[in-house]
């Protein structure tokens, strides 16, 4: 299933600072979007020595590992296309670690991607792809 929404604007500041702000705000908007659609966010930016999971959430009995991809344009491809096979393997390994630390290894899990497309001075467009990989 795919859901889409449109949110406020982000200013067109310096490139490096803007990219960081875009990532931080994109993750915040993604979490809000998920919660508005009945998904419970458990953790944001969970870290271990091997990496980070953007959002860990639940939808009923299903644990969701959600990768957030935020971009200001599509010059380098759509945000949803930015999850490489290497990234998928890495996220799966991180999810196994997260589940193992909580003794939840037998539970149902799902991997979603939330795309935040946010051109300078324009509203953000958010798309949620359930079961992306």
From Swiss-Prot:
GO MF term list: nucleic acid binding
UniProt xrefs under Gene3D superfamilies: 3.40.1350.10
Coiled-coil segments: none
Family: Belongs to the UPF0102 family.
Protein name: UPF0102 protein SACE_6045
């Amino acid at each position: 299933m795919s859901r889409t929404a449109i949110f406020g604007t982000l200013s067109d500041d310096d490139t490096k600072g803007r990219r960081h702000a875009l990532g931080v705000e994109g993750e915040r908007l993604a979490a809000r979007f998920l919660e508005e659609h009945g998904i419970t966010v458990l953790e944001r930016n969970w870290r271990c020595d091997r990496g980070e999971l953007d959002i860990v959430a639940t939808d009923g009995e299903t644990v969701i590992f959600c990768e957030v991809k935020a971009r200001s344009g599509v010059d380098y491809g759509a945000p949803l296309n930015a999850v490489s096979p290497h990234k998928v393997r890495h996220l799966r390994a991180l999810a196994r670690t997260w589940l193992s630390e909580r003794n939840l290894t037998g539970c149902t899990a799902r991997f979603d991607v939330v795309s935040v497309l946010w051109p300078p001075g324009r509203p953000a467009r958010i798309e949620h792809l359930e079961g992306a990989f």
